[in-house]
């Protein structure tokens, strides 16, 4: 707005989003975000034009036509880092610049954009811990500060129109769970920083406890900036002379993981093509068992903590991070089903689905990714249940069939068969499947040597 009269435009690429496995929750959440953004921009005298460009291939023509209609001299846009998005942006930029319209990209999706944090030899990091050290040093040295809100401009008369449906879902789908406005995101951040963050390092792994920020959907669509989150956390850290900063440091680490996985994605195009970061693991022969996959997806495995996590995902569009690790390891380690199937399923359900973070998490669990868990490390869902849902509060909340179950049964679900006949028996023997997976990995590694 400092460079002249400004209009905003957003492209609805509904067909591409469907191909990219966007969930109904995310599509509806986006509509609510756009509705709220329209009101926010109107207060600044800035119109928002919503264009229906079903495929990324349509973006160039729609933006060029719109730019000509309003006499635009310059296009400002935020980069996205998956391969399809990078190709789309490059095509748009080339076309507009060939037609005399300057383009200026920005990077607001992350705290620090890809290739801004590199090793001393100029190569990208593939291990998180040294990446984190350099990230923290850069954050401390740069002293991030939020920009003031611009002054209102003289409004340009443009029609603002938002289609009523995306991917066969309306904007009110999941509205009570995920209001789509910056004020709500700001309130969540305020509530988190004013108390929960002090306990975050101790409570974040317990799904029955409201111990996380719940900001991931708002970060995923840019409703709130990760830099704003970091700035607020840094301010709190500097003024927090009474309480230890363990919670703040742990939460900031989650922002760093988000940057890390996106950097890895941007620097390795094979990941966007459905390939593993560890190229040799693309040769792994995974189980193909539709019945097992369907039982996992529906939350009917017979392992309560796994089923509770999957039912939370299917119902709300969100899953606690500890449960994301438990359920993904169960699929890739105990069922030995291809991580890509789970990755796509999560994206098709998550309101906060981000390709890089979701892919990074799945490849971590499957031992195919960068800085991944070793193949022999497998979360035992029964021990995880004992540790992180000891009284079964979360399990009972998500699985009505187990509302009256004794917590001791959650660590031994075979004992429930007679009392809780509506809940399925365990679908596998954990010990047997663990041994099978270890054998498969050992044999696979031998083929590489």
PLM features: residue spans?
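Glycine/tryptophan-enriched, flexible segments
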Residues: 122-281, 388-389, 393-449
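Residue-level preference for long, well-ordered alpha-helices that form the structural scaffold
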Residues: 26, 30, 298, 426, ...
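Active-site-proximal binding-pocket segments
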Residues: 210, 214-396
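Generic alpha-helical segment signature
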Residues: 30, 182, 208, 299-302
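Trp/Phe/Arg-rich N-terminal binding region typifying the photolyase-homology
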Residues: 1-143, 241, 311, 439-444, ...
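Short coil/turn segments at secondary-structure junctions
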Residues: 21, 76, 293, 421-424
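A broad detector of short, well-ordered amphipathic alpha-helices
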Residues: 65, 183, 307, 325, ...
């Amino acid at each position: 707005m400092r460079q002249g009269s400004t209009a905003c435009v957003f492209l609805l690429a509904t067909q591409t989003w469907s191909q990219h496995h966007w969930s109904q929750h995310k599509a509806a959440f986006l509509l609510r975000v756009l509705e709220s953004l329209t009101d926010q921009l109107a207060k600044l005298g800035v119109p928002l034009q919503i264009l229906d460009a079903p495929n990324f291939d349509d973006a160039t023509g729609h933006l060029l036509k719109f730019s000509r209609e309003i006499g635009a001299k310059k296009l400002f846009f935020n980069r996205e880092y998956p391969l399809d998005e990078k190709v789309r942006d490059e095509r748009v930029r080339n076309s507009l610049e060939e037609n005399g319209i300057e383009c200026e990209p920005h990077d607001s999706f992350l705290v620090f954009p890809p290739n801004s944090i590199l090793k001393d030899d100029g190569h990208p990091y593939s291990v998180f811990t040294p990446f984190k050290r350099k990230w923290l040093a850069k954050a401390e040295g740069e002293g991030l500060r939020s920009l003031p809100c611009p002054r209102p401009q003289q409004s340009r008369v443009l029609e603002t129109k938002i289609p009523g449906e995306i991917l066969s879902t309306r904007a009110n789908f999941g509205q009570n769970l995920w209001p789509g406005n910056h004020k709500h995101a700001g309130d969540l951040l305020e509530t988190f920083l004013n108390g929960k963050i002090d306990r975050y390092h101790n409570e974040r792994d317990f799904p029955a406890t409201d111990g996380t920020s719940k900001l991931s959907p708002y970060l995923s669509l840019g409703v709130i900036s990760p830099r704003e989150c970091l700035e607020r956390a840094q301010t709190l850290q500097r003024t927090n002379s009474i309480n230890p900063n363990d919670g703040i440091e742990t939460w900031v680490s989650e922002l760093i993981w988000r940057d890390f996985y996106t950097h890895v994605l941007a620097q390795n195009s094979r990941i966007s093509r459905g390939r593993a970061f560890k190229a040799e693991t693309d040769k792994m022969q995974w189980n193909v068992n539709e019945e097992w996959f369907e039982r996992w997806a529906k939350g009917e495995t017979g392992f309560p903590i796994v089923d509770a996590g999957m039912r939370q995902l299917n119902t709300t569009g969100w899953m606690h991070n500890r449960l994301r690790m438990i359920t993904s390891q169960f699929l890739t380690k105990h069922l030995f089903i291809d991580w890509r199937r789970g990755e796509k399923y999560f994206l098709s359900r998550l309101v906060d689905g981000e390709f890089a973070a979701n892919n990074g998490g799945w490849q971590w669990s499957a031992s195919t990714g960068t800085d991944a868990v070793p193949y022999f490390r497998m979360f035992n869902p029964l021990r995880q249940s004992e540790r992180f849902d000891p009284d079964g509060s979360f399990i009972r909340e998500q699985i009505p069939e187990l509302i009256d179950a004794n917590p001791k049964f959650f660590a031994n679900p075979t004992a429930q068969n007679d009392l809780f006949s509506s809940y399925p028996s365990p679908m596998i023997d954990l010990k047997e499947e663990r041994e099978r997976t270890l054998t498969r990995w050992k044999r696979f590694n031998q083929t590489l040597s």
